[in-house]
Amino acid sequence: MERPPRRYLLYASLSYAYAILRPLQEEIRRRGDEAAWFLEPSCPDMLLLDERRISTLRDAIRWNPIAIFAPGNHIPDFLPGVKVAVFHGYPMKKRIEKIDDHFTIRGWFDIYCTQGPSSTPYFRMLEKRHGFFKVYETGWTKADSFFSNSYHVERSSDRPVILYSPTFTKGISSAWDLLPTIKRLAATRQWDWIITFHPKLDDQQLIDDYQRMADKMPNVEFARLNKGLETFLRSDVMLCDSSSITVEYMMLGKPVVTYRNTHPGPHLIDVRNADDIGQAIETALTRPEALMQEIDRYTSHHEAHRDGHNSSRVLDAVDDFIARHAGHLRHKPLNLIRRLKLRLKLRYYHL
C-alpha cells in the first residue's frame, strides 16, 4: 500500500531563500511528496506558476507539514513540524572581535544541517552543550545546483565580466567606498560589470547612486537582486569585501578580488587601497595556478559535499530525527520575548 505524500513547508523571509529552498523542493517532488511556501512580508513573491503558496499562518498550520525549512535565523514556534535550519550562507567571521552570527543558537530549531568542516565541529560542540537540537552534516542545499552540470547561461559578449557583490554589514561593506572606483574602472577598462546588492543593503541613496551610474554606462548593469548561480555564471571575476557569497562564487572555480577583507588568505586577492583594484582584477582574470589551488582547498573546507545530493541528505536527516530523536531531547528554552516579537512581526495573536 502506498503511503500518502508527506508535506513540507519552505519558509522564506528574504529573497535569497528561493535559491536555497528550490533544490529542496525539487528533491521533495522527486520523492513524490509535496512542498508549499510561506513568505514573510519582507520576502518578495517570486514564486513560479507551479509553486504552491500558503498565504496565512492559519493555513500553514492546516497544511500540517512534517518539517519546515528556513534559511533565516528564526522560524515560528507555533507551526507544526520539525524545525530545520538550512542557513543562508557559509560561516564568515566578518568582525575579528565577534563570533560569527552563523553559530548563534536562538532556540528555534530542532535540526541544524551543516555544510562541512568550517561549521560541523563547532555545531557538534553546541549540540552537546545545549541538548535540544541535533546536528547533521548534509552540505548546503543551494550548492546542489552548482554541481548538477545542468545549468548553462549564454554570454552576450567575449569581454570580461566583473561581478560586484558587497556585503550589507555596516563598517565592512565596501559599497560606499568603491562607487567612484567602479565608475572609473567601468569608464577606462574593457570590462562589463554586473552589480548586485544583498537584500539587507537597502540604503536608498546608495541604491539610487549605483542605478544612475548603470543608466549612464552601457557596460554596467545594476541588477539589485543576485540570482545566485545564474548571475555567477555570467561573470569571470567577483569583486567583494567580506561577504560569505565569496565562497559560493569560488566553488565554481572562479577567482575573487576583495577590498579590505577582514580575514584575507591565499585563496583571495585582497587589496587595502582602492587604487589597486584594477590591477588585482587583471591578475585574477589570468587565473594564476597557485591561486586556483588555494581556492579549491578553501572551498572544500566550507562545502564538503559536491555530489549534488545535499537536499536528499537534508530530507534523510528529517526522517532520522523523527525516527530516533523527536521527543527525546531537552526542552527548548522558553524564548518568551523572541516568540512575542515574532508574533508581533507576523501579526499572529492566536494561541
Where are these regions (language model features)?
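Active-site and donor-binding regions of nucleotide-sugar-utilizing enzymes
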Residues: 9-149
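Conserved catalytic-core segment of nucleotide-activated headgroup transferases in glycan assembly
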Residues: 17-29, 141-211, 306, 310-312
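Catalytic donor nucleotide-activated moiety binding site of glycosyltransferases and closely related
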Residues: 34-44, 48, 188-224
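Active-site regions of enzymes building and remodeling cell-envelope glycoconjugates
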Residues: 48-58, 80-89, 211-222, 254, ...
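Donor nucleotide-activated moiety binding/catalytic core segment of transferases
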Residues: 55-61, 203-250
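A donor-sugar binding/catalytic signature common to diverse glycosyltransferases
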Residues: 73-74, 79-87, 225-268
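Catalytic binding pocket for nucleotide-activated donors in carbohydrate/polymer assembly enzymes
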Residues: 132, 212, 244-306
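C-terminal amphipathic helix plus adjacent low-complexity
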Residues: 279, 285-351
